């Protein structure tokens, strides 16, 4: 029986590690367009001021904390149009 419990220790350790790593990673997003021109302004257009703007491989990269569960404005608009279509069809 001791051997069976010791075989479960390694998978449990990996599960804990992966759970912690996912929580501590920030969210990155590329803004594709022209070469890195006005990256800070581009990031501020879509994200809060807590994001950091960098140029990476000729693209703007917005780095910062992950947003909460609320969808971004772009996705809220898409979802609201789907709701309108569903209301029209029903």
Curated annotation (Swiss-Prot):
UniProt KW keywords: Antimicrobial, Disulfide bond, Fungicide, Plant defense, Secreted, Signal
Disulphide bridges: 27-66, 36-55, 39-60, 43-62
Keyword presence, Disulfide bond: yes
Signal peptide residue numbers: 1-23
Single GO biological process annotation from the record: defense response to fungus
Secreted recorded as keyword: yes
Sequence similarity: Belongs to the DEFL family.
The protein's name in its UniProt record: Defensin-like protein 178
GO CC term, one of those recorded: extracellular region
Species assigned in the record: Arabidopsis thaliana
Subcellular location: Secreted
């Amino acid at each position: 029986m001791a051997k069976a419990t010791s075989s479960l220790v390694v998978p449990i350790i990996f599960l804990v590690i992966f759970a912690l790593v996912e929580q501590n990673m920030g969210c990155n997003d590329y803004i594709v367009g022209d070469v890195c021109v006005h990256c800070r302004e581009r990031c501020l257009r879509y994200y809060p001021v807590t994001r950091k703007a960098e140029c990476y491989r000729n693209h703007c990269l917005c780095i910062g904390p992950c947003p909460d569960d609320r969808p971004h404005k772009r996705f809220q608009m898409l979802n609201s149009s789907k709701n309108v279509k569903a209301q029209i069809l029903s």
